[in-house]
Structure formats: C-alpha cells, structure tokens
Amino acid sequence: ACKRAGAELRVLPVDQNGEWILDKLDSLIDSKLKIVSVAHISNVLGIKNPVQEIIERAHRFGARVLLDGAQGVVHGKVDVKDLNCDFYAFSGHKLYGPTGTGVLYGKREVLEEMEPWMGGGDMVDSVTLAKTTFAPLPLKFEAGTPNFIGVAALGEAINFVNRVDIDFMTAHEERLTS
C-alpha cells in the first residue's frame, strides 16, 4: 500500500523483550511524516505500549496518530481525549460483539478536514454538475447501507462490557500474568 501511494514505511524497532526502543523514535519522525499507526497494547506480548509519548512526539511534527485499540478496549478503560490520539480503532468481536463490526473514533476537527473515500447513501447532501456537497459528520463517511443488526448487537456488547467492573478484571488479569 505504501508503494502504491508513494509513501515510505518507517518501523520503530523493538528490543529483546518486545518493547519499543524509544531512543530511535526521533530519527523516524520529521516534517514529512503524515501518520503514525501503533498498537495501544500488543496482541502478541500483552505489552502496554507508551503511546502517549509517541503521540506527543508525532504531534510536534504535525503527524496524525492512529491507535489500534483492539486489545486496549478489553484490557482497561480507554479515554481517547486523555490519550489525545487522532484516531482509535477496534473490532467488535474483541468486545464480544459480532464479527464484521467495529469502531473508528476520530477527532471532529480531523474528520471534518478529510474527504470521503467512498460515495453513496445518506452521505451526500447535494449534487450538481459543478460539485458535490457532503452531509455533516458522521453521515459524511456513511456510504451505503449500514449493518444495522451488527451495530445494534455491538452496542449491546459494549453495554455488557461497561457493566463489568473493568478495574477488577484488570487487577485479576495482572494477578494471573505476574
């Protein structure tokens, strides 16, 4: 995908324990950097990555940050505003919801700058021969027919997870893995 887009993929190395070598980060970040994509928590090693440091450094150079939250949302409370990430994504099945569902959080100001990459459905506000005007957020990115059943089921899965004492679960998990 990078090759097709003319982009350069930069990878932050890890040490023998699977932890990022943050000393190498500054050599990877510059004014050309557009987006940083990192896992909030590693699905392989379970390491809680120091994402806030990555986010702060990337933002200093004007880069956007996408956090893969597939493991983060089931292993503790997530506050995207506190993290200050631009995007946070996770799949529904990680929260005991149906496959084929997921969530993409995006900062309003970032989403408003973006153009839709698909067309159709309620995302179009008006069309003339001269231009197309898109609906306001979130409809601007809702092309086609939504997965109504999947979204309703995902909502119930999220409600279930919110009823569980996540602090107890996290403490129990830490006892099991230490």
Q: Which residue ranges define each predicted feature?
A:
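Pyridoxal 5′-phosphate
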Residues: 1-178
